[in-house]
Structure formats: C-alpha cells, structure tokens
Amino acid sequence: MKKYRDHYFLKAKQENYPARSVYKLKEIDNRFKIFRQGMKVLDLGAAPGSWSLGAAEKVGPRGRVLACDLQETDTVFPDNVTFMQENVFERSEAFENLLDEIAPFDVVISDMAPRTTGTRFTDQARSLELCLEALAVADRCLIKGGSFVVKIFMGPDVQELVQAMRQRFSAVKSFKPKSSRAESKETFYVCLGYRGVETSDTDK
C-alpha cells in the first residue's frame, strides 16, 4: 500500500470517517468555501457516508444534509443528516416528496462513480452519464447562487459536461485534491453561482 494511501486511510480511521474520500471534500471546501453554517446540502452517491459527515460538520446543527445512494450504509449519522437508499435515475415518489420538503438546497455534491469494468472508455462514458444526471437533479432543486460539486472520470467527452455546467453557473473550476490517488483519472468540478438553465429563444 502506498504511503499517501496509508496516510489518508489511517487518518480516516483515527477520525471516525468510513472512507478517506472525506479529505477530498475538505480540500475542495478549503479552496472554494462552498459550505457555511445553516446550509442545506444534497449528497448524491453518499455511501458509505464520509462526504455526508464532512458536510454535516460544515453546516452545523442548524443545517441539513440529505444523503442518497443505491447502496445502504451502516454509518451512524448525526441528527442533521437524513440518509435514503435511492436510485437517482429512477427517483421514487417518496424521494421526490422529500426533495420538495427540504428544497431549495444551497449545495449539491456528487461523488457518484460507476462500477468499473476495466475498460477506460466504458468507465468514462458511464461516469459522464452519472454527472449529467447529478446536474439534472441540481436543476431540480438547487437555489439560485448555489454551488455544485461533481466527480468525473476524465475522458474525451468531458467537454459535454463542462459546457452544460458553464451554461448554468457563473464559475466552473476543475480541481484534483492532493488526497486523490496519483494514478486516479478522477477530477472534481466545482461550480459556483447557479443561474438556472438558460433557455434559447427557439425553446421558449
């Protein structure tokens, strides 16, 4: 096991996080200041729960985190986190109702990743699909001026996502945290200042 992996793996265990990925979110927030006390956060692809725990710390007891994932998790969350086992591609009526109850969200974060096949092109295409679905959820429930953070496996089609995000946000920044593994193809896009979906005259 590589030294940097040892460091973040052990650090997560020592600080009672279920996964090392929380340090990626912490780096993102340190750089871009996306969280504030009292905010409402939607966490897509939340299991095993490290990002939700990290976000919950940042928004505090007056804030709220709605976490969802296809997989169940046995992580014990604080009172300001609600976890729901859910497929964001097939959002149930119960999930839609919960979105309506809590929305609008100040921040939508997505650490979703596909089951990898070992075929880079396939994995990248599936990652893009997840990112676009996360963006569609953000369109559904993100407040104007809000922020969106999404992970993608880099590939030739990433510009499709970047263009879609630039149509919606005042600023779109790419960022690879130091806590990401060096060989990983993942990159995070941090989008600030949500404007909404711009509609052309022909679409009106």
From Swiss-Prot:
Keywords noted in UniProt: Cytoplasm, Methyltransferase, rRNA processing, S-adenosyl-L-methionine, Transferase
SUPFAM superfamilies the record matches: S-adenosyl-L-methionine-dependent methyltransferases (SSF53335)
Keyword set includes Ribonucleoprotein: no
Catalysed reactions listed for this entry: uridine(2552) in 23S rRNA + S-adenosyl-L-methionine = 2'-O-methyluridine(2552) in 23S rRNA + S-adenosyl-L-homocysteine + H(+)
Cell compartment(s), UniProt: Cytoplasm
Database matches in InterPro entries: RNA_methyltr_RlmE, RNA_MeTrfase_FtsJ_dom, rRNA-MeTfrase_E, SAM-dependent_MTases_sf
GO cellular component, one term: cytoplasm
Protein name from the UniProt record: Ribosomal RNA large subunit methyltransferase E
Originating organism: Nitratidesulfovibrio vulgaris (strain ATCC 29579 / DSM 644 / CCUG 34227 / NCIMB 8303 / VKM B-1760 / Hildenborough)
